[in-house]
């Protein structure tokens, strides 16, 4: 459950380390984002020679949340922290690698490129 002002780790090699959610996309009154949702983020911490700089405003896909995700079979999956992958306007990842596991729910949201780059799909 990601809302405005939430800090997230970046799970790709785009150059950003930490980002902060500044808007949840998908409706004027929408308050929360979950796995697979697109948010607008501000880069708060970045490595020196990365593709993005501190202060850049980007779009990102939420790939991990500390709030548990309920599945149709009754099982629950949750992660240790919140993480996102930076994407461009065509919803393609900016980085070329994804770090850490990602949930299967991204497939239903048509984020196939993120699924294919991820080392582990839970």
UniProtKB/Swiss-Prot annotation:
One of its GO terms (biological process) is translation. GO terms for cellular component: cytosolic large ribosomal subunit. It comes from the Bacteria. Part of the 50S ribosomal subunit. Forms a cluster with proteins L3 and L19. In the 70S ribosome, L14 and L19 interact and together make contacts with the 16S rRNA in bridges B5 and B8. SUPFAM superfamilies: Ribosomal protein L14. Keywords: Ribonucleoprotein, Ribosomal protein, RNA-binding, rRNA-binding. The keyword Nucleotide-binding does not apply. Belongs to the universal ribosomal protein uL14 family. This is Large ribosomal subunit protein uL14. Transmembrane segments: none annotated. InterPro entries: Ribosomal_uL14, Ribosomal_uL14_bac-type, Ribosomal_uL14_CS, Ribosomal_uL14_sf. Binds to 23S rRNA. Forms part of two intersubunit bridges in the 70S ribosome. GO terms for molecular function: large ribosomal subunit rRNA binding; structural constituent of ribosome. The keyword rRNA-binding applies.
């Amino acid at each position: 459950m990601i809302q405005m002002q939430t800090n997230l780790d970046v799970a790709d090699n785009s150059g950003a380390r930490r980002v902060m959610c500044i808007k949840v996309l998908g409706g004027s009154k929408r308050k929360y984002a979950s796995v697979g949702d697109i948010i607008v983020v501000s880069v708060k911490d970045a490595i020196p020679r990365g593709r993005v700089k501190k202060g850049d405003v980007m779009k990102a896909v939420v790939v991990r949340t500390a709030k548990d995700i309920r599945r149709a079979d009754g099982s629950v999956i949750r992660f240790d922290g919140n993480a996102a992958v930076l994407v461009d306007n065509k919803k393609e990842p900016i980085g070329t690698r994804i770090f850490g596991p990602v949930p299967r729910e991204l497939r239903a949201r048509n984020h196939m490129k993120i699924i294919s780059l991820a080392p582990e799909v839970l």
